[in-house]
Amino acid sequence: MADTLMSDTPFWQRKTLDEMTDAEWESLCDGCGQCCLHKLMDEDTDEIYFTNVACRQLNIKTCQCRHYERRFEFEPDCIKLTRENLPDFEWLPMTCAYRLLAEGKPLPTWHPLLTGSKAAMHGERISVRHIAVKESEVRDWQDHILNKPSWAE
């Protein structure tokens, strides 16, 4: 009976992030693309500012990396979120499954692991599909800061 209950319970509810396989870890990503938007850091305060400027490898329509398996070859500054460095990424969106599970919170109802597709996530406008712009179209990066400080107004 206990084995049946274990197998009926989704892995993200019965395992810690450290206990997950690499495939389980990867499947937690909802594919919103928020990690793939460029961030700017204030050199004086180390504060991070979010932009709507997409990485060159991000397909804005699908919110997927064009070269995910080889992304570090194309974008050396691409982030690699791991179990070990997760605490360093305080800027992760409040909707991020990695963040939520690390904080002991459930996955949102629109998460692809619960719905079986990314449609609900896109419908909730969680993905960057509706706000992202191509890096090649950007002239002044400050015009694309989403959480503008007073000095950038």
Swiss-Prot record:
Q: Pfam families, from UniProt?
A: CxxCxxCC (PF03692)
Cleavable signal peptide: none
The family database entries (InterPro entries) matched by this protein are listed as: Puta_zinc/iron-chelating_dom (IPR005358), UCP006173 (IPR008228)
What the entry lists under PANTHER family is as follows: UPF0260 PROTEIN YCGN
Q: List, alphabetically, the HAMAP family matched.
A: UPF0260
- NCBIfam families assigned to the protein according to its UniProt record, in alphabetical order: PRK05170.1-1, PRK05170.1-5, PRK05170.2-1, PRK05170.2-5
The family line of this record is: Belongs to the UPF0260 family.
Q: What's this protein's name? A: UPF0260 protein YcgN
Organism name: Salmonella typhimurium (strain LT2 / SGSC1412 / ATCC 700720)
State the taxonomy lineage.
Bacteria, Pseudomonadati, Pseudomonadota, Gammaproteobacteria, Enterobacterales
